[in-house]
């Protein structure tokens, strides 16, 4: 019997694609190569700064209902914020809040602290390295109280405007930068809308920062198109809330540290209430002194007897 021949291994040919190669994109300057486009886009994309600002908003225990409503108004205006439960600890409040900020993945904090059910203090903090600012909040008017006609879409990004005197001193420049970072909503945030329809106004009057929120309104019909940049027809309608910030101290760290600035014109609410009590006590003392003076005057100047006083008594 003859030997069987060894069959050589059959090599399978690679399948030929019937479809034509994908056509490159055409531009005004010619055909666009995908490889060059990818290479050119990598360093440009890597150099783009992405704002990942997140703000933790919380308050202390035993806060007044008006101040709690103000905090909820701020939460509704800032879609990039995270609301947390009330903080109880007093002695270690700074350490507790710093830990909360780290757990929530936030970089800033707005802490509303209420004392004696009357006074509201607001901490504006950059964590973990600072700085931090402590304000006394006055002239609080919430959206529910004002009932203004302005209305803007929830989650839309605001335009931030500052008065010119923010550039006068160094501490005002620092406060302007902190307000810009905290109240400025990051572009492309998942809870924000990609356009502007309201304005946050920060103005300095009598060394106080006054906050206002206005809607940008453009009256038009459905058939009419809005001219781009037509500022003559645009009007501002106030939405709310309103409040006034009186800066007390600026610290170098988060919820403490070295004092960078202290307001020399600040007067605490306790001193104001004590002065009012003294004035009231002075009014009461003046009344008592007036009564004693009147009695002494009556004793020193008695009435002369009248000859007709007992005329009808004999009958």
Curated annotation (Swiss-Prot):
Record's note on what induces expression: Induced by glucose.
Q: Which Pfam families match?
A: Brix
Q: Where is this region: Disordered?
A: 1-35
Q: Which domain of life is it from?
A: Eukaryota
Effect of disrupting the coding gene? Delayed growth rate.
One Gene Ontology term from the biological process aspect of the record: rRNA processing
User: Which GO molecular function annotations are given, in alphabetical order?
Assistant: rRNA binding
Every copy of the Brix domain together lies at 53-256
| Tissue specificity as recorded in UniProt | Expressed in roots, rosette leaves, stems, flowers, siliques and seeds.
Question: Which spans of this chain does the record mark as coiled coil?
Answer: none
* GO CC annotation terms, alphabetical: nucleolus
Q: From the Swiss-Prot or TrEMBL record, state where the protein is found.
A: Nucleus, Nucleolus
Which keywords annotate this record? Nucleus, Ribosome biogenesis, rRNA processing
Annotated TM spans: none
Q: Where is the composition biased (Basic and acidic residues)?
A: 19-35
Q: Which family does it belong to?
A: Belongs to the BRX1 family.
What is the recorded function of this protein according to its Swiss-Prot or TrEMBL entry?
Involved in pre-rRNA processing and required for biogenesis of the large (60S) ribosomal subunit. Required for proper development.
What protein am I looking at?
Ribosome biogenesis protein BRX1 homolog 1
């Amino acid at each position: 019997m003859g030997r069987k021949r060894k069959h050589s291994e059959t090599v399978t040919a690679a399948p030929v694609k019937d479809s034509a190669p994908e056509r490159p994109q055409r531009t005004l300057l010619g055909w666009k190569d995908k490889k060059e486009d990818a290479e050119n886009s990598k360093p440009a994309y890597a150099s783009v700064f992405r704002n990942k600002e997140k703000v933790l908003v919380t308050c202390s225990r035993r806060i007044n209902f008006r101040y709690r409503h103000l905090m909820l108004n701020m939460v509704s205006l800032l879609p990039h914020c995270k609301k947390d439960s009330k903080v109880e600890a007093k002695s270690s409040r700074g350490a507790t809040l710093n830990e909360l900020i780290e757990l929530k993945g936030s970089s800033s904090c707005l802490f509303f602290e209420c004392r004696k059910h009357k006074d509201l203090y607001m901490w504006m903090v950059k964590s973990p390295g600072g700085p931090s600012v402590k304000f006394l909040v006055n002239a609080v008017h919430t959206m529910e109280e004002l009932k203004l006609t302005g209305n803007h879409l929830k989650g839309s990004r605001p335009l931030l405007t500052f008065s010119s005197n923010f550039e006068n001193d160094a501490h005002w420049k620092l406060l302007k930068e902190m307000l810009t970072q905290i109240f400025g909503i990051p572009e492309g945030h998942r809870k924000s809308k990609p356009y502007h329809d309201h304005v946050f106004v920060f103005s300095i009057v009598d060394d106080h920062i006054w906050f206002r929120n206005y809607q940008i309104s453009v009256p038009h019909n459905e058939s009419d198109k809005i001219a781009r940049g037509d500022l003559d027809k645009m009007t501002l309608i106030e939405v709310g809330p309103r409040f006034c910030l009186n800066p007390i101290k600026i610290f170098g760290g988060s919820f403490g540290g070295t004092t960078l600035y202290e307001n020399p014109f600040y007067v605490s609410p306790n001193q104001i209430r004590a002065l009012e009590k003294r004035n009231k006590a002075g009014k009461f003392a003046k009344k008592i002194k007036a009564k004693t003076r009147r009695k002494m005057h009556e004793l020193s100047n008695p009435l002369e007897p009248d000859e007709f006083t007992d005329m009808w008594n004999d009958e």
